[in-house]
Each structure stands twice: as C-alpha cells, then as structure tokens.
C-alpha cells in the first residue's frame, strides 16, 4: 500500500507486499484400486516416477479379442498417465513362454505331425481313433462346465461323421485316392482327440526340448504384430520366463529360506497357512472370499500338474507350486531340488521383483487373474521382500463378452485380433474401447462398433470442415480476426470443456465421459460455424484451428491417432512438404540415372551379369516399393511411382504372360522336335522297305519293294501303281538326303 | 494383518487395510516474478487454466534480434507450461498499430515519396537539403545519448559526401544523366534528413488517414512471417489497437469516473498521486525506484507528445497520457473529449482487460518495458477494476547484446531476424536461446552460436547412430533382448536424468541446465553403445529408441523440432505417417544394395569405369540430396539421411582437405625433385673443378684443383688441407656415381 504520507516525490524504494493467489483445489487423479475396490487418490512413491508391471500373454495360440480388451485398455491408461498427467512411467511386461499349456500344445503338435508323416493305413487310423475315443468319452462325462461339455460333444459328433465314410471306403475297397481323402478328413476332425491320446501314451518319450521354445517364439512374434496393428505401444522392457530361470530359482530359494516355502518330492510349494498366520502379512488381499476355492486354485496349477500325487505333496490344499519337478517328456532346468520348471505365479514375482524391486506403483492384469494368480504373486513377493506393500495400486481390466455371451471356443464366438481387424480398423476398435470404462465388462457387438463408427464419422466431418476453412486464401494477418461475442463464448466453452475433460480423466480415467465432452465441444463448434455461415461471415480460423488441434492432440494421447514417432531432427528442414511423390522422386531419379550409366558401360564392355542385376532391380525389387522403371531404347528410363498393389498385380500378370509365352515356346519347340524326329524316322526308311511292313494292304512286291498285288492277291491298277511309284520316288529323295546328312555328321 | 485366530478355512471375507504411499514432496514450478524479484511458487488462480498476456510489437519496421530475444523465450516458456506442465494456457498478444512512431514514419515516408515523385531539379534539391540541415544540426547538438549522437553524425557526413559531387556536376553543366545519378545518390543519403524536415513543415497538412494503417499492416504481416520462420507459435488470440478503440475509450472513461484520471485541454491524464495515495493501490510496483524518472516517462509519452504545452496540461510531471488530443496531420478517433487517439500504455490495459478480465495469471514483456509501460498498465487496470492484483506473475525476458554491445542502428550492429536466419537455422537460434536463462542478458555472438552448432551436431550424430542401430534387421522378438547390468544401469541413469530435468524445469524453467542434462544423457548412451560394439554385441534397441524418443519429445516441447501439426485423422490410414526418413529410406536401401552388387562385379571383372561411377554417386550426387553413404570394407554400406547443408559443407570440407593433401603431396614431390636436381648438379662437378670457382677463399691450386694457398697467398695449414682433401674425395665418389648413371642412361 502507498505510504501514508501520500508524498510522491522520488517514489518509495520498496516493492509492495505480494502473495501467491489462493488458487483452487486442483483435482487429482484417482484410480480404482482392486486392493480396496475403491477409487483411491493416486500417489507415486518416488516423485513423478511410476513403476508398472503388466502380466503379458501365455504364447501358444493366436491372440484374441480378450487379449485386445486388456492390452488396448492398459495402453490407454499408460498413455494417459504418461502423456496427459506427465508421470514418468516405466512399463514392464512379461511373456509367459514356459507353461503347461505350451508344453502340452507343443508336444501334441509334435506327436500329431509325426503320426501324420507316418501316413497310417486307413484301418490303423480307424483303430487308433477308436482307442482315442475311450479316454475322450470318460473326460466328456466328467465335464460339468456347460461350455466345455458342448465343445467336447461337438468334437465327438464331427469325428463320428468323418469315421463312417472311411469305414465304408475300406469295406467297399475303393481306390487309394478316395480312401486317402477320407483319411485326410478324419485326421483333421480327430486332430484334437488323437493329439490328446498320442500325448497321453507317447508324451513322456519326447526328448526334443526345442519344440518347447519354437512354438512360443512363433506366437510371441504374432502377438507383437497384432499389438503393433492395434497401435499398442511396446513395453519399455519385456521379460521372458525362459530367460529368467536363474532369477526364479533364487527367488524360490529365498522364500524357502524365509520360511514360507517347503520342498516336497522334488517340487517346492508355498506355505499359505504359514504366510497368512504371520503378523507382517495377509494372504488373499484381492479376493479373500476365494481363498480355499480349489477349482480356481487347480486352474492356476496348470493342466500337467493336477494329478492326485501332486496334491498329496502339499501340506494344505490351499498351497500352490513355486517350482514343479518335471516328469519325462517335460522340459526341465537345473535347480537345487533336482530337475524341474517354474510354477506359473512365481515367474511374475521374480521378473517384476528383479526389475522393479520391493514395491511397485502399479500392477495390471485381466480381471479373472485376481485369484489365484495375482493374490499368489503378492504372497510370493511379500514373502520374499518381507514387506506388505509389493503393489500399491492393482488395476484389473474388465471382461469382454461377444454379443452378450462369454467368448469361448465352444460357442464358436472366438474372435482373433486378426479377424476383428478385417472388419474394423484399429482406430474404430480403440474408439469403441474409449467409449467404455476400462474396468467394466465391454460387450463387443455390432451395436458397440456401430456407435464407434458414428463417433468417428462425426469427428472426421468436423476435421474436414475445419481444414476446408483453413484453406480459404487469406493474407497472413487475416487469420487473426477480432473476436466478437460468439468467439469469446465459443472460447469459454472450449476452456470449460477442457476443465470437464480434466475432471473426467482424474476420475479413474473415465474416457467414456471424455468422449462425450469432446462430442459436445464439436457440436458447439458446428453451431458456431453454421451461425457464421448464416450471416455470410468467415469463422475465426485461429480459434477453430486451436480447438481442432486440441481434439487431435487428445486423440493422439489416447492412441486413436498415430503419433509421428520419427526420431531426432527431421531431415529436410522445416515445412518439407511431405507429399510422397515430391519427396521420393529425386532419389529415384538418381537411382535410375546410376542404373543407366552402369548398363551403358556393361553393354560396351560386355558384362552380362550387371545387365541381369539391372533387370532384376526393375522387375523384382522396385515393384515391391511401388516403383515402375520403363526402359526405352536410346531414351532415358521413365520412372513412375505407382500404387504398390496395382504394381504387384501387374508384375504377377507379366510373369503369368511370360510363363505362358515360355510354355508356348517350349510346346512349339517340343512339337517341332517331334516332327523332326518323325521326319528323320521317316527319312531313315530305305524306299525298298517302305511298303514291306504294309502286309495288311499288299500281298506281293517287286524287287525294288514296290507292291504289285493287293491283299487279295489282285494285281494293282495302273493308277494305284503310279501313285505308289510317286511315293517311292519321294522316299528315295528323302533317303538320299538322310544318307547325305549321316555323312556330314549333322546328327550330334 | 491376518486375523489373530490364524484359522485359514474358507478365508477371511475382508480385504486388509490399505493406505496410499507417503510419496515424496513433488517439486513444484517456481517462476521469477518481477513483482517480487524472486522465484515464487506458481499457482494459477483457476484450476489448470493460465491466462497470459504478452506485449506484442509496434509494427513500423522489420523485426530484429531484440524481438527474437523476447518472442522465442516467451514461446519456450509457453510451450513448457502448456506441453510439459500441462497447464491450460490461454495466450493473448497485441499488435500496436497506433503509435507516434508509426504516425511519424508513415507521414515521413508519404511526404518523401511525394517529394521524390515531383523529381526536384538538382539546384532545388541542394537548396532543400541545406534547409533541412539547419534543424538537423540543432537536433544533433542537443543530442546527449552517445549512440544517437554517433548515428546523426554519420548521417550528416554521408549527406555532405553526396552533396559535393552534385554541386560539381551542376557547376560543370554535366549531362542530364550524370546529374540525375548524383541526385539519386543524394536523395537516398538525405532521406531521413529530408523526411524529418518535410514532416516538420508539411506534416500537419496530411489528411489521408489510410497511410496510417497501410504501413503497420505491412509490417504486421512481416512480423508473423518472421515468427513462423522462428517456429514461434501464433497467439491464441491477437488484438490490434486499431480494432479496440471503443473499448479503450470506455476504459479511460471508467478510470476518470473512478477518480484516477482527469481531462485537460482535450487529452486525458492519469493522476498518479491520487492513485498512489489510495489505501487500495500502490504505484510503481515493478520499479518503484524509477517513479519520477522524467526521461523514462517522456519516452513512454511518444515522440509527438512531449512538447512543452503537453507537459503543462499535467497536474504532476509523473502523470501520463491515457488519451491524446490529435493535432492536424495526426489520425484521430471520436471520443467524449473531442478528437484524439489512445496513449501507449492504455491499449494493453484495455485489450487485456477485455479478454482476461480483472486478474490474469501471467503478463510478459521485454525487460526495458517495466517502467513506465508495465507499471502504468498495472496502475490503469487496477484503477479501472479497483483491485490490487491485475497481474499475479510478471515475467520479463532479458536483454540481447550483439557481441557484447547494445544492439542499435547507430552501431551498425542492428540485425534483423531475416539477416540472422541467413546465417543460422531457426533451430540453431533456438538451441542458443535454450542454452541461456530466459531472464538474463543473452549475448548473440559467434561464440554463442558456435556452441549451439556443436550441441546440434553432437545430438544429431547420436540420433543418426540410433537410427542406424534400429535399422539392423532383427525379427520382431529380437527388439526385446534381455536386460543385463549395462541396460539396467543405463535405464537408471535415464530416469535419474528425467528427474533432474524435471527439477530444472521447475526451477524457473532453467533450460540451460536441462540442455546440459540432455547432453550428459547422450554421452552415457554413447558410452553404452561403444561398450557393446567393443564386445561385438548389439545394443538394446528398445531402450535406445526410448531414450532417443524422449530427447526428441523434449526438443519438440522446446520448439527446436517441428511438431507434426496436421489436424484430425491422418489420410491414408495407419503407418503412412509421412516422416521423410521413413518414406525415403527404403528407396535408398535399394540404391545402396544395387550399387554394392554392381561394385562387386566390377571389381571381379576389373571394370574401373563402374567403380568411378559408384564413387561419383557417393561423393557428388547423393550429398546434393542430403544422403551420406559410408562404405566399410567387407561390411554393408551405412546409409545416413543428413541435413543437406551440413552435408554440402562436409563435402566442401572434404574437398578442401583433399585439395590441401594434394597440394602438400605436390609440394613434397616438387621439393624432392629440387633436391634431386641440386644433388645431380652437385654430382656433375668433377672434383678437380670443385674449388676453382672459390676464388674468394683461395689464390693457388695444385694440379688436382685442390687449394694450396688462401686469399692472402698464405699457405693453408695441414688441418685445412686435410679437410679439403676429404671434401675432394667425397666429390670424387659422387662424380663417379654420376658417370655410372650417365652410362646406363638413367636420366630420361
């Protein structure tokens, strides 16, 4: 405040008192934490760093929409925390490439291929199928789960349908080919059945360990490609169980040393009672009500490890395997307790523990992994680190249903990611996910997708309109027109919407509300643009561009628009107009000129290999890049940038035509050769012998071999004799020619 | 904790207690606030919204490096607050297009063009120049400021230099053409002088108001183009004084109504004493020590408004004009007090007040605007809104010096932005700014720019190397190799650096420290890459790519790398993100492989012409397109897409070095030849003649030509004779060698 004297001479020397504004209570990010089943304020443990571990796929088959449900939602959460809230996220994911499902599937595929390669006789196959049906029927009767039962019945029915025709073919001794086709059909239908049976009988003799790594490596590559296609960011670090076995062994050993694990018959089990009774720990933090649920526990133990003897090794049925002794036919690794392999739950504890240490901020996974997998992970790690906070925030993505039903192979509603991407683009799928909450069930149906498509179209129209407005020619000062009330009001709405969107993202990343707020903002812009149009006035370019850039920016944060992920300084300086043609043509020109220079020298100096290399460049390599070189004698080669697919089709067509031409030429050459051979064969016959073999026409011949009497001994007429004489002379000429050729050796 | 009973039957029904982690005290953004001359914690008034007003340019001439100093630094601050700290920034800037400088410049240009179009006779021009020199000399004598005085003297001198030749041409009645050329030269040199004189005499008769809008509109366009070239983001809203006169009039009226302004002789002045004495207000918040500084105040009143009568209209010399009555020849707008135009300070208060209301978060401007401009803005607005917090945080960018000196037209070190961009790219300028604190003085010198160029090169080589590593063909699972200690350590450094960078940005957006931290991070990566190369192992692609993407992202936030600002959904579906690199590299790869194939055959079949063609492609043709081929014996050629200018400079450098080497080689060969010739010449002398020519040393010789007596006829001592004998024998040997060579003709 001014000094009381009010005297204003040379001015006070001191700046007045200042205090920061009160500001408003900033709304903070809350996340739904499965550890409390509540939305909790999110506080990272160390500044802005967020350590995050997500359970990756078990890689033994194509990834399906259930995977998409989890990995697209976690991708959205990760991007929002990283790019919107600016947390410094360190995101790790594992690949389960050692697992009973993998072992079983690899062994079955291996044994079935071996069986098929031996090309069993029809009868043998029929016998084996019958043998395989016995254990199958037992399993069918024991199955209670309706979905699974239905699936097994379907297999049984298909096998019967394929068996009958083969039996008939065998009984009616049909040809090899017809039997073989029935064999093929039965082999295909009974594949699962036979594989199971072969595995149960021959599984333990399998010693080729490579089959247990080839299968997962293939499906891991497939998984990455699917994720790329869905625009899911790769993890910051990826861990594979097969590469962390030593760390897992140490992890198990320490749990045993800490008194929470015990060795039994070559396997090691986790002592849940011991752990639960300790003051420092709690078992079953996520799903306490599931503790003791044997069915869930068994599923966690893996198909090859739920035999009765395994159960007997445990002190309590609630205990679970940390390390499993391997039976013959199962891959194994050395360890203090004999030869075996990791249990399922321990992998994640060991790998996440190695990378993220004693306490991570976020652990994510699918909803159905809560128990036993995640609860057991928590127990293992808290037993290892002797703490009670291995995971601070546990996030579970909701289920995915297909048109209301659970997705399962039996209901034939099993949709792979590749299938889904044939029907919709990655962006449309992602918009659908954004329009749902990440933690609730998402029904993947035509309705769901229809509303996503509508949304995409609504937004796209808006972007196109704004781009059109921005293209209107205006001088550089014209883009900044004075704001009237409408601009001020639209701008106010814009900032209010941004605040609302911020609030929604703070509320457990509620993207459904965000998408509605974005839709409302676009509607407000549409109203503004229409109002300006009505009074023949140009809408304010800078304001509309700002709003459109904000919406594009949010879509990029959500991964619905691909971010330009180029590295470092863009080459070519600012504003290099990146139309493909203008960009690429200079480089192609250089390639073409270099090729021509090289061909010229090669022709002059007779270096055919270089000419072939130049042709291969034109015909095989460049078409792959959508480039067509057209060589014209004596003229510079014409360079064309064409749509790649069209070009490849053209190449195929050219090859087909060339192939046909080649075949025709070959055909013609063959026929010519045959004619020559026939001609030669004809020339070879001495005229004197030419008629002798025609005993079906003539009965007597003169001394030159010319026929004199026909079959019935009747003397030939003058006309007939004259005609034969002519043939005789013609042959004489040919024969002379033949002798001539034989002389100058032209028959090499 | 587990329930005390330890009984683990069906499991407890309740999840254990959970509490959020303590987390660490997040470091918050502090900004240096000129209102306290301290770094203050930055708290926006309403959630994440940040209202921000920046004083834009007075548009009457080309923008210079002083402008760049302010607008690049504010662009960096704005981008960091918007894209890094994710504040919801609303950034307004004005264009001063009504101002005494504009009025004077427009009128002078107008009158001078009229004078020139009348094509004055030589004699008339000479007379007028003399007339104009009178007031000019008065002004020169009155000028105290050393810079200004030097500039006026320079003009005076130049005019004299141009006057003499014209006078002579007139006296010696030279041809029309010669006279005209002298007239043109004098007109050009005396332009400022004549314009001033014409304006002082004819200014008041100018009535064509359009000249007062054409000049600023032109230079506003020029300013926007310069900003675009510097990659400075356009403001969210731009206000022009000429479009806000009604709002300004109301603003002045309300200040008068509130009792802080008074009308005097058609102008309106701000009553600083009244304002300062009020309990609710303080005057001179930014620079209290400058209150009363008449010189500074006068500069704020504008060149046309500091006449003595204007001063007499003020109640106190500290008062300043809110509204100025317009004199003839000055543009004017209707208002309650007759015809006039806005004062300088009131524009910003009125425009910012209209858009941002009673209290904004940030006001920015150049350091030398603190007093009187910004202090008067504060007074006006707080008088209007009757509050004491019109601006919460006042940010001033530091000065710019040119190689240590103040930039000024008189010192001829006045560098326009266009000049600067001819010498360096916008990115290099921005890197230089980033490597300095935004609030301190920045010296624009070759040193400053050299360190920026070094920095750019250091980063660019890193990006190129990472891109080369990422191109190494690896199957899709290969990009995720298991982390060893080196990867874990590099990753730890990476996250520590990100934390350090966050801390530096919180500390008043200290980009200088950030750039050093980024440099250190690159060095750590280089060490890691070198270590992996040393043990013939591939570096971890995913980790290096992550780090490179982070650095690129930070450079984009700082505006040093252009952001892809396309709107909406990219055309052409996913993966067509048209980064030049991704687009062009496949074609370059094909060119490189074709070249390698051709070189291989050419070497095998000894076709040197093709090898020369391949070298020419690498050395002459591809650099033009910014492509660098690096051939490594026995390894595939490394393809690098580099900035074209850098590459051409490199090629020039390479040629210069090769040229130098060639010259050195030639030089050495020439010297060698000379030595050999000298040696040969020496060998040719028969020993008998070798001393004969040395008559300055010896007077008598024996029969073999050996000297016996010195110059004075004195016999040589034994020692001397012995020494000469030795020389004689050495020459004998050489001579024999020479005869030998002559015989076997080795002198072609």
From Swiss-Prot, chains A, B:
A biological process from GO: cysteinyl-tRNA aminoacylation
Residues binding ATP, per UniProt: 409
SUPFAM superfamilies documented for this protein: Anticodon-binding domain of a subclass of class I aminoacyl-tRNA synthetases (SSF47323), Nucleotidylyl transferase (SSF52374)
Sequence motif: 'KIIK' region, positions: 101-104
Protein's UniProt name: Cysteine--tRNA ligase, cytoplasmic
Modified residues (Phosphoserine): 19, 305, 307, 746
Organism, scientific name: Homo sapiens (Human)
Motif annotated as 'HIGH' region, chain positions: 57-67
E.C. number(s) listed in UniProt: 6.1.1.16
Region annotated Disordered, chain positions: 1-25, 653-686
